[in-house]
């Protein structure tokens, strides 16, 4: 039986849309380098952890770009599915992707069944755990997922890993979006205000914790986290290698003194086999040789371990550039 991952954060996150400005500042111009090369990282919404991850990686790459000639930029996108498709099209070099979305893309399953296998998808390293988190209006008195029947529920924006995972959970329950009276498609930076304004009763969100997009509604209107458990969840976790049970700590968010049980994936950093070995090697080196700095750039990264990042949650083969660095450092 798989173990339950514990998220080990002991403090709350006071962060909002200002995160975008913070990471823009981190990407300030540096001296031009000869034979400069550009790499782009697909992330997610500007208030989410994926954007923070991309910003942290680019910050460390750009720090030494006068030496290696690579300039890194972050793209705010619709999320995991969009990132995979755009990497496949050659329009992005790298991206942050849920491990389940990466698995389906590489194997041509799930939402990628019609498109077929993306056999050039390559893993770079994994990041933080992402529990699927159900957040509801306090007044709605929702105690379990079953209580959401007939409610107004945000299922995630199209192209996001959250949306793909929501649809998989519903299918496993023998349900579809008609289970809700309204299935809204708001972005993560919109769902908190919609909840507090009474426009929706809850939302589903796969995210690293603590998250500003959950901190805001739990602070502003006492929003409640709801555990996501039961036989269907147990079967999903046992069936799919990219899932694990996850516990969100008691008191991580205001007005939520209880531990919240759920399941989830890992965020992973991916690329294409078409991206040069030297480029990926340089990006990996920038992160792993400034690892303590990287961990400080967002609370979700605080308990990352190098040894876990080279093996856990990787849904596609390692890119040769990443593999070369990891072998040099004895991590493989």
Residue ranges of model-derived segments:
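Bacterial N-terminal signal peptides that target proteins for export
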Residues: 2-20, 28
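Sec/Tat signal peptide C-region and signal peptidase I cleavage site
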Residues: 28-34
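N-terminal (or domain-start) structured segment
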Residues: 35-104
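Bilobed "Venus flytrap"/periplasmic-binding protein-like clamshell domains
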Residues: 38-64, 70, 126, 130-197, ...
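Pocket-lining segment of extracytoplasmic ligand-binding domains
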Residues: 99-101, 110-111, 140, 176-270, ...
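A structural signal for short loop-to-beta-strand junctions that line the ligand-binding cleft
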Residues: 113-127, 132, 252-261
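Ligand-binding clefts/hinges and TM-proximal coupling segments of bilobed small-molecule sensing domains
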Residues: 151-168, 242-304, 308-311
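An extracytoplasmic/periplasmic, membrane-proximal ligand-sensing/linker region
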Residues: 190, 197, 207-225, 235-238, ...
